[in-house]
Amino acid sequence: MNIGVNFFGPKRSLYHDFDGTLERLKQSGLTSAEICVAFAGNGEPPKELNLQIPEEIIRQMSGGIWPLEVASERLAAVRTHGLTVLSCHMMLGFQTTPEQLIGMLPTLLEFGTANQIAYYVFSPMKDLNGIKALIPAIKKVSDGLAEAGITLLLHNHEMECIPVDGVTALDYVLEQCPNLGLELDVGWAKFAGADPVALMQKYHDRIPLLHFKDVRADACAANRDTCFTAIGEGSIPLRGIMAAAKDCAIVEHGLIIDQDDSPTDILEDLARGAENIRAAAQ
């Protein structure tokens, strides 16, 4: 079973020892990577999350979130280490406007075609009211990428899974944008109080990539940035998720661990998480 990793999680390790970290990931049985590229914005977190990130940590984040000007070179290095790369997480500014999103399309097309990117992933981090203004831009970008054979995927956080007047941003945007796929993050869905298995069943034909994240049973807004566990050691229904994955349109190398952080050693967590995913699939 091929299992990958999103580079946001091991960002500090990649910052301190890029090549050594890639080798450790391979030795852990991970076979692919989802890169994160800063296409726009200053990288500052939204104020409503109330995160306090020291400057040194922001510098270390560059290990996993690459500036566009060095992304192609680093991507080539990742592939040289034998890791498959199909997808790129677009790291946008949290206040990205519809006009700015549309304006990125030529750059996305250029980078994607030059680097054999099959999927772009973006995280709006908006509820229903916030997502509505972005719909025309999402349509235009997803349609433009589709013409080049690249699929745009929505990656959810908890905001997209919390209903507003009975409707979630996730449901609304997928209904409005037929060329948009879904990279469901099961951990953020669980954090929001949603049922990740039910979401997988509902959108089974629109999920080519699946993000594994696990959170403690007491995960809440107060501990949002420290609630992560190795996959299979928190509160997500991992066996149910793996059973539902069989009926989804998940591609080879489409199972991706996206553990944001670790209270101990992120690389050890990733290794255990991969083992737990494989065990849950049996």
Each predicted region: which residue ranges?
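N-terminal pre-domain/capping segments
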Residues: M1-A114, Q282
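C-terminal helical cap(s) of enzyme catalytic domains, especially alpha/beta-barrels
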Residues: I266-Q282
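Hydrophobic faces of well-ordered beta-strands that scaffold small-molecule active sites
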Residues: I3-N6, A33-I35, V85-M90, Y120-F122, ...
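Active-site acidic/histidine proton-transfer and metal-coordination neighborhood
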Residues: H81, M90-G181, L267-E268
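Acidic/histidine-rich catalytic cores of soluble enzymes
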Residues: A33, D143-S235
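A structural motif
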Residues: L30, L83, A114-I117, N179, ...
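Active-site beta-loop-alpha junctions enriched in small/polar residues
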Residues: N6-P10, C36-A40, M90-G93, P124-D127, ...
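A short, acidic, flexible beta-alpha connecting loop/helix-capping segment that sits on the rim
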Residues: I256-I266
